[in-house]
Amino acid sequence: AFAQGQSTIQSWDFNSGIPTGWTQSTNATDGGFGAGSASSLSSQYFTITDPGSNIVATNDDDCNCDKADEYLITDTLDLSNYSVLHATFKSFYYGATYSGSTESAEFLYTTNGGTTWTSLAVLTPAADWTSQWIDVSAACGNSNVQFAFNYQDAGGWLYGLGIDDFSIFAPYNFDLAAESLDLFSTVGLNNAPFTLEGTITNYGGTTITSMDLNYKIDNGTTVTQSLTGLSIAPYQTYTYSHGTSWNPSSTGTYTVDVWASSLNGGNDQN
C-alpha cells in the first residue's frame, strides 16, 4: 500500500548529483546542500545512515556557519493539467535543539520564481531516515511551479537535513493501508476474547468518510464492521478498534489479517 499512485510526474534519486536546473539560496560558506554518499556528507554529530545510494544534504554540524535560511530549489514544473498531486521523499532530520537554538525544515512551493514561498509541510523529525508524504495539490493548476526544501539553523550550531528519493505523483483516489495491529505475538488463551486494535493510514487523494473494517483469522470467515461518519484526510492516520472481538477456541498459531474495504462505498485501488 506504499506504492506511488497511478502516474509519477517527476522523480529524482540524486545518484547523479543535484539535478540539472535546480538552484540554491544560501549564506553558508560551504555552498549549502551537497550531493554524494551519506558518509561523505556526514560529520561527527550529524552522522547520516547510509541508505544505499547517493543523497543530497546540508550539514550545519560540519560547517557551523550561516544556515539560517537555506533553500534547495527544483527546476520549473508545469502542473497546469493536474488537480490532485502528492509528493514523497525520505528525510534525515533530527529537528533538534542545542544551546537554545532549534533547527527547522520545511517543504514549500512558489509560482513566481521564489519571490514568495508557500509552505506545504513542516518536516517530521526522526532519529533515522523517515518517509514524508505530502499533499501538494495546492500547487496544481499552475504552469510555473518550483518546489523547495528549506533548512534553518536558527542562528545556532545544529545538525542538518538529508533528502533522498523525491517524487511528485498522482495518487490513487482510494488507498488505505493497515499500518499496525496492537496484539502481542504471543497471548494467553485465558485472556480471551481479544480486541483487534491498530492504525490505518490514508495514502489516497480522497478523504475517507466511510469504510468496512475487516479481519480474518487464518482462512476463516471474514468479520466485518461498517464504519460511517469518519473524516480521514490524505496522509492522516486513524486508530481503529474492531467491534467484534476475537475469541479463539484453542491454543495454537494463528495468522490475523486486517484490512479496509468499501472506501466511501468504492474499492481500494491499491
Which role does the model predict for each range below?
Residues 5-63, 100-102:
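Extracellular glycan-recognition surfaces and repeat-rich motifs
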Residues 14, 72-96, 105, 143-153, ...:
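Extracellular beta-strand-rich recognition modules
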Residues 58-70, 122-127:
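Extracellular beta-rich ligand/substrate-recognition surface
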Residues 107-111, 216:
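Conserved Ser/Thr-centered positions that define the repeating blades of beta-propeller domains
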Residues 115-140:
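Extracellular carbohydrate recognition and processing domains
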